[in-house]
Amino acid sequence: MSAQSPQVRQPPATPTYILRGHAAAIHALQIFHQNLRLVSGDADGWIVVWDLVSKRPRATWKAHDGTVLEVKGFSFGNGAVTEVFTHGRDHKLRVWRFSLQDEESLQKVLPVDIEKTSSTAASQPWLVHSLPVNALNFCAFSMVFLPPDKANTASDASEAPKENTSLSSVLIAVPNALNSGAIDLFHLPQERRICTIPADTEVQTGMVMAANLVISPSGELYVASAYEDGRVMVHGCRGSLQEKDLTQSTKTPWKWEKLYVCRAHSQPVLSLHVSPAGNYFFSSSADAVLAKHPIPSLGSPGHAPEELPIRSINTKHAGQQGVRIRSDGKIFATAGWDSRVRVYSCKTMKELAVLKWHKDGCYAVAFADVDVFEVREKSDEEKPTVSPNDNGNQENQLAGRAETEFSLATVHRQRYEKVQNTHWLAAGSKDGKISLWDIY
């Protein structure tokens, strides 16, 4: 009789919720609006904006005629207005907008319940921008918001009416339409190309597979990119972004310098993601390797690019994609072709958890933001307390407070705060389902 192991085995993790609504594979996910909304995109071009409190759709529409490569959602005015950026295999990058009042009239029938013969154009959000971009690479777009003063300058230079432009001023990186190894940078709301990062002339990298924009604290723009031959690179643009001319009259080319190049993978790179601090990034590939890379700062001109990764591990699990780092920079997750979601430590790259529920391969993951609540908790602590000597009304105030605590409004607020404080990890699969996990 074998001796029993003294180690207590923990039960396997199970998802907290399953969101069923897509009829095709989930390719893009993002949690936004202080963790109250989740936006998802599938292989049929459908977008669903979910309410994470009720776990029901707030808006559904067919954004593209092809697969959705990436989707990003943002809320403005404390949720009064929502903008959704979508990138499809139909070679379109689109920006959609709807207000809180519009949500009542928007279509909420989920894609899995919509008949193919029914109209897909009704009750859509307002299409603000539609840019023709390259989508042959399977490379999703990356975006950064411009600093406020730079955004104002760019907006002043645009002749488009304010109501016909996006609420935000952003730079967007996509693969070049003519050279699949080059990267184009576009500006919104101007809807024009600002510059191009040329393909590497020393080696044949193949197509751009992933890109990520980041602005340093000093205002310099960096682009981390990954390629078909397994290489990853970092390019930096010398000079603060504030000094760049984004107007339509610009003739001065942006000067990009290659700061880092490393062939960390033997297969095409599937994804990369830059840390919240902007000082490193992770890459994943069709092989089993995960790599952590530096983002070197711009040194003296002509300095040779760095070539050594910070750390590289062989996970023995090929085909991990959709790598995402959580907002606190402590953990990151990958979506696996083997249907498993894996969670790793950012510091040690040690595997912390393997989440299995889906039967088919997973393509996308998304984290909830975990650092937006310190401000709210601090503001709650700073609320004035009731003095026991205030006009002798302490008893009445306590009674009123007790009544308020059990009011429907308070219950509603508590539901919202519970959702906002949950450390969600969302995973999207080929089966069209989205699993929500509460971990770490």
From Swiss-Prot:
One of its GO terms (cellular component) is nucleus. GO terms for biological process: chromatin organization. WD repeats lie at residues 21-60, 66-107, 205-245, 264-303, 315-354, 406-440. The keyword Nucleus applies. It comes from the Eukaryota. Keywords: Chromatin regulator, Nucleus, Repeat, WD repeat. InterPro entries: WD40/YVTN_repeat-like_dom_sf, WD40_repeat_CS, WD40_repeat_dom_sf, WD40_rpt. It is found in: Nucleus. The keyword Repeat applies. Belongs to the WD repeat ASA1 family. Component of the ASTRA chromatin remodeling machinery complex. Component of the ASTRA complex involved in chromatin remodeling. This is ASTRA-associated protein 1. It comes from Aspergillus niger (strain ATCC MYA-4892 / CBS 513.88 / FGSC A1513). The gene is asa1.
